[in-house]
């Protein structure tokens, strides 16, 4: 398969945890981003308090000489306050991905709620990037051909495309990437992996689903009802040997949709324990603009792998986890989690210009 004509160049660390802030003592990581009505770029980091309790904060991105260099903290925008976002001994709203969905004129945040039955994907929306209104947990339509119910399984790495695409039926649709996890041993010992019919590889892979654009325009609650899901990208390269997941919202490029993703290799613990001994690296895939279910190209090697100290050592070492991409002054910058402890920035560049 054709390789991806893009590369990432590491810029540096933009945000580290504040040891004097009890909400940040266990790390800042895996941010979303959004442009505010004031023309400023805002970062939405996952901040982690003692006991692995995560919140989503907001910070203004400080730009110097055309590139992001620091942040100005502005407080918390989402906490695990809803009953389905916390359990008896756990809580969290985690790993936001934020997409400005142009046909709706809205910023859509997808995040992971760490509730009583483990991680569950959810959504919130905003018009001003300050106040976020929850739409609730994500639900997947029943598809008899899968011989399964996607709602049984934890699902992470959900992210919207920024513009409408043709759905499988040809109707204008909003496309959503998601990543189901089939192993149910965390819920009931011995249950094991239960992939749907037709899926022979039970490693977590990237799926795509759709929301009818006309329906979403009439009723925003429709955004949480994802239909017509199917797997599109399974682990293939060596750095994806354990699992793969979507990163930022896909970026429109001349070749199609550029999707940055994380690939995971090495040890994989059961359940939701930190994956010590694993390695997270950033790769890229290009999806067809006319049919994003079709892969045009993918990277055989990582675009960015853990190398510097902030990426190698932290709460979970050896992690590069891309979650946001923004254009500043004609240059594309990727924001990523570093070792589950800090936030870094890299520049995305074409390699064949």
Per-region residue spans from a language model:
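Short, conserved clusters of charged catalytic residues that mark active-site
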Residues: 245
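Beta-rich carbohydrate-recognition and catalytic domains
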Residues: 1-26, 30, 34-91, 100-158, ...
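Electrostatic interaction modules used in gene-expression and signaling proteins
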Residues: 325-327
């Amino acid at each position: 398969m054709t390789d991806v004509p893009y590369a990432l160049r590491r810029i540096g660390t933009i945000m580290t945890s504040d040891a004097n802030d009890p909400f940040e003592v266990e790390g800042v990581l895996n941010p979303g981003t959004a442009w505010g009505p004031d023309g400023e770029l805002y970062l939405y980091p996952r901040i982690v308090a003692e006991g692995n309790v995560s919140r989503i904060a907001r910070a203004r991105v400080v730009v110097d000489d055309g590139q992001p260099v620091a942040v100005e903290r502005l407080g918390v925008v989402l906490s695990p306050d809803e009953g389905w976002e916390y359990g008896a001994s756990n809580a969290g709203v985690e790993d936001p991905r934020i997409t400005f969905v142009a046909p709706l004129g809205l910023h859509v945040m997808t995040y992971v709620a760490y509730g009583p039955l483990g991680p569950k994907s959810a959504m919130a929306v905003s018009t001003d990037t300050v106040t976020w209104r929850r739409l609730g947990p994500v639900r997947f339509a029943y598809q008899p051909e899968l011989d399964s119910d996607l709602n049984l399984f934890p699902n992470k790495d959900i992210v919207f495309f920024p513009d409408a695409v043709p759905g499988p039926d040809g109707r204008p649709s909003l496309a959503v990437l998601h990543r189901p996890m089939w192993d149910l041993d965390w819920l009931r010992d011995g249950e094991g992996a239960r992939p749907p019919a037709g899926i022979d590889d039970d490693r977590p892979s990237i799926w795509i689903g759709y929301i009818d654009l006309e329906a979403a325009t009439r009723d925003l609650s429709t955004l949480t009802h994802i239909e017509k899901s199917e797997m599109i990208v399974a682990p293939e390269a060596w750095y994806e040997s354990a699992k793969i997941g979507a990163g930022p919202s896909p970026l429109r490029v001349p070749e199609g949709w550029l999707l940055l993703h994380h690939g995971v290799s090495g040890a994989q613990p059961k359940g939701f324990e930190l994956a010590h001994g694993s390695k997270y690296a950033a790769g890229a895939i290009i999806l067809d603009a006319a049919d994003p279910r079709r892969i045009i190209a993918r990277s055989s090697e990582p675009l960015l792998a853990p190398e510097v100290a902030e990426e190698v050592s932290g709460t979970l070492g050896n992690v590069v986890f891309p979650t946001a991409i923004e254009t500043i002054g004609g240059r594309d910058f990727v924001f990523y989690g570093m070792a589950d402890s800090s936030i870094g920035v890299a520049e995305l560049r074409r390699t064949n210009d």
